[in-house]
Design a protein with these regions (language model features):
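Eukaryotic, polar/proline-rich low-complexity intrinsically disordered regions
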Residues: 1-183
């Protein structure tokens, strides 16, 4: 049997990152939605979401995908949106010397040619640790870890952002700033 919390977390990711229209709601331009509105819409679509469960998912998610507003009235996804026009109000940050990206071998030829592209998302997601990048890459198969020369990119004028859950975000990573982890 599937864990109901995992199922609800995936449902929230769908609604808050990609398809709010599946339950007839819209997000504001910063990705927020009133918690009461979300709960009512989820309930109307057969989902048993309560205020307590939502807060538990926000607080206990190992990936910290979601955030509650300071006033406790709204919720949003921290990053990963494919919805156009969402502005997470991120400010540029100075990245560490290196960051990491987990992927699979099948896409390496394209990455070597084009670099890392954001595809349908707003940003390319990078990790501060190899372990996190391995977990991300392993979702699609045997992971290949790419090392990103983040500080060199920053010094070349490329802006980096850091989401509320510590994921580093950038518009793209040109191939000259990438190398494969040989370990």
């Amino acid at each position: 049997m599937k864990d109901p919390k995992v199922t609800m977390s995936k449902f929230l990711s769908l609604v808050l990152r990609h398809q709010p229209q599946t339950i007839g709601v819209t997000l504001d331009r910063h990705g927020w939605i009133e918690i009461d509105t979300l709960i009512a819409a989820a309930s109307a679509h057969g989902r048993k979401l309560t205020h307590e469960l939502l807060l538990e998912l926000v607080e206990t998610s190992d990936k910290q995908r979601f955030a509650v507003s300071d006033d406790g009235l709204r919720v949003r996804a921290n990053q990963g949106h494919s919805i156009h026009g969402i502005d997470l109000e991120l400010t540029p940050q100075v990245p560490p010397e290196t960051l990491f990206h987990g992927t699979i071998a099948a896409v390496l030829p394209a990455i070597r040619r084009e670099g890392l592209l954001k595809q349908a998302r707003h940003h390319v997601h990078l990790s501060a640790s190899i372990e996190t990048a391995e977990r991300v890459g392993a979702r699609r198969g045997k992971p290949v870890i790419l090392i990103v020369a983040a500080r060199a990119m920053h010094e070349a004028g490329i802006e980096f952002y850091r989401s509320a859950n510590g994921v580093w975000l950038v518009d793209a990573v040109p191939p000259e700033y990438l190398r494969e982890n040989s370990e």
